[in-house]
Amino acid sequence: MSPDWQGAWQALTHHPLFGIGITLGAYQLAMAAYERTRWVFLQPVLVSMLTVIGILLLCGLSFAEYRNSVAALTLLLGPATVALAVPLYLNLRRIRQLFWPIILTLLIAGTFATVLGAGLAWLFGAERIMLMSMAPKSVTSPIAMLVADQIGGIAALAAVFVMITGVIGAIVGPSILRLCRVHHPAAQGMALGITAHAVGTARALQESDECGAFAALAMSLMGVITAVLLPLAIVMLL
C-alpha cells in the first residue's frame, strides 16, 4: 500500500502546533539572518511576517486557522510586555534623573507623531475614517485598536498602520538617529519607543539595556497618554 502523502500533508498543516512551529521557526531564521548580515531590511519582524504569510498561502491555510493555532503565543504577549519592566527597574535611577525631560519629550514628540501622520493623510485627501484609523499609529496594537474604535476609525486598519509604523521605524530609525548625531542611549530609546512602539523597543534592546529601558518607558507612557488624550482632543476639535 502506497503512503498517503496528501493525507499526511493535510494532517501536518492542520495540526494545532503547525502555526506555532512556523511562527517560531520563521522568527528564529529571520533573527539568524539579521545577526549574520546586519542588513536593516532583514528586520526580524518584517521578514518573519512575510515568511509566515507565504507559508500560509502555499499551504492554503486561512488566517482564522492560523490565529486559532497560535492562540498560546497570543496569551504570552501579556507576560512578554510585563517583562519590559525589567530594564526599566534596572535603570530606574537614571529615569528619575531625567524625569522632566522625559515628560517634555513625550508630550512634544507624541503630539508631533500623532498629528504628522494624520495631517499628511488629510493633505492627500484621505477620508475621515482613514484619518481616525491612522491617528493612533504610534502606540501598541491593542491600545491603537481600542482608540481607533472610540474615535470612529476601523480597528483592524489601525492595527495595520501600527505594524507598518513599527517596522519602518525599526528599520530606518537607528540610521536617522545616527545621521542626526543622536548618540545618547536615553534619547535613542525615547525616539524609538514613541514612534515605533513595541517593534522599536525590541530594536532598542538590541542597542543597549539603557536604550531599551527608555524605549519601554516611552512606549508605555505614549500608550496611556494616547488612550486618554486623543479621544478628548477629537471630541474638542471635531
Predicted regions and their residues:
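Transmembrane alpha-helical segments of multi-pass membrane transport proteins and ion-pumping complexes
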Residues: 19-32, 49, 53, 57, ...
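Internal active-site segments that recognize and position negatively charged phosphoryl groups
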Residues: 91-167
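Alpha-helical membrane segments and immediately flanking helix-loop junctions
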Residues: 130-157, 161-165, 183-221
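Gly/Ser-rich, low-complexity
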Residues: 1-2
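Helical membrane-embedded segments and adjacent short helical loop/helix-boundary regions
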Residues: 7-23, 27-89, 94-101, 105, ...
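Juxtamembrane helix-boundary/capping and inter-helix hinge elements in multi-pass membrane proteins
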Residues: 38-39, 61, 89-100, 124-129, ...
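Proline-rich low-complexity regions
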Residues: 44, 87, 135-136, 231
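Residue-level detector of alpha-helical segments with a strong bias toward transmembrane helices
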Residues: 53, 70, 101, 150, ...
